[in-house]
């Protein structure tokens, strides 16, 4: 196996199967199912539950159409991931791809922006878990539940990627079962009692429908998909080559999109309030999904979904924390972060210090937010900007590698120009529609990244071309 240290190239062979791991390399133990489990855990199969009411109000009742459009939009990004993982099958995901396609400087900025979200998305998920558990057991403060969730999932990640994947599979199976219970219950109620709205309304909208409203809602709905890209960060730990990673990225997105479309379509048919009524009552939007379940099926399903969300959120954070650890590991291996973080534990085969570093930052952010009444709003308002910026650089990397540098032969224009340009354009529009606080945080984080890059460049590493 050729060395990867310092160059980012050459992790092509399988890792050791014994108890030791070559320095700077991760152990290849993950299969296709494991990759899909990590992706779906990070996304969460019932991710639309919390924002269903907001999307229904914004889109004029066409919430299922919103998720159809959002799946197509994010499909462009998934396709670009699939292109780049084949030419750079290494840990680090978009950091590695931007280095390959655009150069060292752009690679660092892409990784730096992605790191913002890889640290904050798990913090939001941990906070969701703490809030849900506090609602079930109010005697224990939500910040304590939040800290417990961080501790348990961090221990699982340190145990090893294969062990964490096995536990994650059990949790994911539980979430899928709860979702199936909702689907079956909703179908029974609809057959027995009929729908609260027209059968096509979730696809065509009501009197307040407009395509502009749908696109505005899509800018919110794409947040449900953040996390599928984490699959690419495990590229050095998968058996069977980079094609398996590419297939897992695309499969995970299509499966998650299908689940989102089905559940929002059924929930919209059960929703007793019209989209106009929801738009006029913002306080009702957050609980709209649960209110529809209560009114049509019963509170027992409400409680079942709530427990599923509490456990599922913690394990969504587990997958996010694991991905954050791999990103930190990859950047440290290239000496963009302290090289100590690139060490791989010889027993578990995971980047232990990188995971611990990510866990500490996430713990501080999550507990800080859990102790504030407005903490959730602060985190949610800024959580997407880093990933969206990194996705734009991902699309640019495809053009840079296949078209500008022509490193893989003649480009295929629809794959290497049309799809990346359309995908980047849509993402730029979403960034423009982001909240002011998200844009400010993103710009500040970007400015710090440029300062770090300038310092590293002055030391001779910042602007060199990728090998």
Residue ranges and their predicted role:
Residues 95-99, 105, 126-145, 178, ...:
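Helix-loop-helix connectors at the membrane interface of multi-pass transporters/channels
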Residues 143-196, 249-254, 384-393, 415, ...:
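Membrane-interface loop-to-helix entry segments
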Residues 386-387, 414-467:
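A generic transmembrane alpha-helix motif of multi-pass inner-membrane proteins
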